[in-house]
Each structure stands twice: as C-alpha cells, then as structure tokens.
C-alpha cells in the first residue's frame, strides 16, 4: 500500500531539521542501481547539498552495478554497519523488498528514489512515471500529426519505473491517437545505450516506415538516435527519452532528439536528503510503516522549443 502526491518540485516543500546539536554521528547509506550514471551522480550531489551542512552526518555510497543480487548483499552490509538511514534505488522492486523490511525492522529509515519496493517503507521520491510516459505519448503524437508507426525500447523486467513509463505512453496513444500503431517493443538489458542501438537497428530493418520511438530512459534514447543517424533516417523519426540528463538536453537543442520527460535530479536528491534528516530528528524508526509516503514529481516536456526553460545549473 502507498499514499502518493504529485508536486511541482520546490525545495521549500520540506525544510530539513538540523542534527548538529546531537553528539552522535549519523551514518547514511546510498545504494542506487549503479554509481556513475548521470542521474545517480546528480542524486548524490543533491543529497550532499544537505548532508555537507551537517558535521554529524556521514554518507556511505555503494555500487551494485545493476545487479539485484549484489544490491541485496550490500543492503545486508549497510544493515550490519548499523546505518541510521538508507537511500535506495532498487534494481528490482520485488527482490529488494525483503532487505527493506529487514532494515526497517531494525530501526533503519529507508527512502527510495524513482522506484518504490513492494515492501512499505518510510518514503519514495519519484518522477511521476505514468504521467511522464503519458506526456511523451501526447507530445510525440502531436509531432507526428496523430498517425504513423512507433516503437518502444523497454526497461529490464522488474524495473517498475520503466514499466510505468511504458504504461503511460501506451495509455496516451490509445486514448488520443487511434491513427498511431505501436509496431514493436523490446527490452534493453541494463538500460544500456549499446543495447538500445542493437534494438533500434532491428526496428529500422523491420519497419520501412517508422515515425517515432519512445526509449524509457535517456541513455537508450541516445542509442536509438545513434542507430537512426547511422541509417540516414534520423530526420524522419521522432525519438523521445525520459529523465532529462544533460547530454540528452544538448541533443534536443541540436535537433537530434525530439524530446524527453525532464526531472531535476539534483533537487530530487536534495528532497530525499531532507526527508532523511527530518526522519532522523525523530529518533530511530520505531515500527515499520503500513504505507509508503510517495512524493511524485511532475515531469516537464523538454523539446527544442521548451528546453531553454531549464537553467544550466539544473542540468545534470
């Protein structure tokens, strides 16, 4: 069970309480799906905007390299270290549920980023993924004039973030554009650009007419762009991503990618850190929550005529 709200992200929404008056050192684990990705780096930078002001807070970052099994082991390690809170981006929402339950049963707050586990926990700060996919479907449909063939480059199984983005996209196409046909959908393992290149090449070979492609994250959208450009068909295909990383925004400005559902990951990380701080100020977690408090951030359609509205300092 979860209770959720969608908001246009403003950092005044949560004012973090200070822990500096307390004598103990607070250890906070950061466990994304992979260290070194634009979004996971931006989340960490956003969190440090909050944590660096607190001399009693220490952040421990671990890299499971996109492996749910490794991530479960690292959760066990953070629990054994007696972390006070863990900020988690689960590789698999089901596979990490047992780890989250164990952490919170031992009094450790868990805040997830982008994907909530099936196990209820303190909070989850997410892009509104269904809304993001719907937004992409709506805007792509306008760009291709409500008709044509489109394809989807999907997320790995178990990644509810990608599943929800695809769900929203399909809902928009079905509701708004009866003249659009989804001609293919394939999973890009590991969300990787090189896998998306291979999938896009297969779409191009199978479809002499292809008008749009939705890749459920920006890395994969960039892979689709590379393949379409190499085939000499980029001008005919509207390629969309989701997340809003800086490299994709640059390609939108160049006219090579049609758009992305943008999320300010710096601010998202900052908000997650403020939730952690407020939770720790209450003392150790007394009991496992019955529901997850889900904060969903409204996406922004970054296209060539709107991308300039995103300030440089908010590009990650």
Q: What is the role of each PLM region?
A:
Residues 31-44, 60-70, 92-93, 115, ...:
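Hinge/beta->alpha junction and helix N-cap segments in small-molecule ligand-binding domains
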Residues 217-225, 265-281:
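Extracellular/periplasmic ligand-binding modules, especially the Venus flytrap/periplasmic-binding
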Residues 8-18:
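Bacterial N-terminal signal peptides
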Residues 24-26, 160-161, 172-174, 271-316:
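Hinge/cleft segment of the Venus flytrap/periplasmic-binding protein
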Residues 20-28, 144-147:
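Immediate post-signal peptide segment of exported/extracytoplasmic ligand-binding proteins
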């Amino acid at each position: 069970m979860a209770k959720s709200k969608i908001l246009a992200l403003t950092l005044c929404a949560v004012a973090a309480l200070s822990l500096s008056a307390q004598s103990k050192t607070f250890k906070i684990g950061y466990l994304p799906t992979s260290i070194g990705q634009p979004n996971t780096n931006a989340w960490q930078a956003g969190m440090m905007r909050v944590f660096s002001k607190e001399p009693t807070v220490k952040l421990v970052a671990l890299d499971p390299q996109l492996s749910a099994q490794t991530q479960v082991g690292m959760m066990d390690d953070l629990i054994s270290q007696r972390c006070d809170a863990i900020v988690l981006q689960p590789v698999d929402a089901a596979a990490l549920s047992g780890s989250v339950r164990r952490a919170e049963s031992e009094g450790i707050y868990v805040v997830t980023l982008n994907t909530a586990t099936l196990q209820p926990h303190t909070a989850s700060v997410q892009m509104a993924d269904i809304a993001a996919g719907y937004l992409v479907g709506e805007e792509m449909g306008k760009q291709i004039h409500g008709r044509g063939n489109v394809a989807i480059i999907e997320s790995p199984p178990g990644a509810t973030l990608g599943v929800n983005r695809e769900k929203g996209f399909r809902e928009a196409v079905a509701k708004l554009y009866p003249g659009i046909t989804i001609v293919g959908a394939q999973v890009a393992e590991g969300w990787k650009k090189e896998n998306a290149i291979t999938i896009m090449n297969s779409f191009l070979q199978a479809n002499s007419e292809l008008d749009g492609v939705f890749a459920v994250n920006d890395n994969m959208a960039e892979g689709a762009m590379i393949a379409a450009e190499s085939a000499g068909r980029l001008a005919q295909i509207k390629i969309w991503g989701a997340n809003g990383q800086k490299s994709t925004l640059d390609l939108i400005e160049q006219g090579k990618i049609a758009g992305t559902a943008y999320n300010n990951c710096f601010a998202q990380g900052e908000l997650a850190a403020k939730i952690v701080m407020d939770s720790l100020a209450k003392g150790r977690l007394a009991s496992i929550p019955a529901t997850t408090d889900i904060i969903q951030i409204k996406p922004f359609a970054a296209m060539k005529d709107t991308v300039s509205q995103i300030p440089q300092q908010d590009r990650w």
